[in-house]
Amino acid sequence: MKRSIEDTPVVFIGAGNLATNLAKALYYKGFRIVQVYSRTEESARALAEKVEADYTTDLQEISKDAKLYIVSLKDAAFVELLPQITEDKQKSLLVHTAGSIPMSVWEGHAERYGVFYPMQTFSKQREVDFQEVPFFIEAKRAEDTELLKAIASTLSEKVYEADSEQRKSLHLAAVFICNFTNHMYALAADLLEKYNLPFEVMLPLIDETARKVHELAPRDAQ
């Protein structure tokens, strides 16, 4: 009997905002999330309960039998833990979800590896509609590229291949659009609070500004 792609056993290494949203989305699509790792038991258990998986806070206890390992950690933690993450997983596919880290980080540590990058801002408290999230895929082997594209396609209609240089530019552009904008919102909120004005009066302006770039080039909408 031919196995479906959803039968692929998946381990999540990380239980933060992105990992939580992505693991839940794959779980809702029928994927088998077999284990969740996090440094903190509270985070590991919380996500594991949502996707009916085991959990651990010990890297040595991470299952060696999964077919796919999705690593979603802070950049510094990922680089620090890389040797332990990849130990005894030569036959498995390992991917990270970072826009800013090149695929070459895996070289010398894994045989099958890649990048599975959903470009969106995530929080644990708010579920994202993955149908609208663009995924950017890169893998060392062509067959793994196709596997990752197939997995992403179960979640989103917007799946692209992008190399590490392209993804770095995507990540930088996303920082300008999201992080810088949020910082400006915070400054505006502080100013309004100083004069006893509610931030909600800005929401129609924020919404219309965002809607404009769906129809006009950013420079034309200025």
Language model: regions and residue ranges:
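NAD(P)+-binding Rossmann beta1-loop-alpha1 motif at the extreme N-terminus of oxidoreductases
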Residues: M1-T56
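Phosphate-coordination loops involved in phosphoryl transfer and adenosine-cofactor binding
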Residues: E6-P9, K91, E132
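Hydrophobic Val/Ile/Leu positions in short beta-strands of Rossmann-like dinucleotide-binding domains
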Residues: V11-F12, V71, I137
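Rossmann-like NAD(P)(H) cofactor-binding subdomain of soluble oxidoreductases
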Residues: E41, V51-E127
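Internal alpha-helical scaffold of NAD(P)-dependent oxidoreductase catalytic cores
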Residues: S43-K50, E127-H214
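C-terminal active-site/capping subdomain that shapes the small-molecule cofactor and substrate pocket
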Residues: A217-Q222
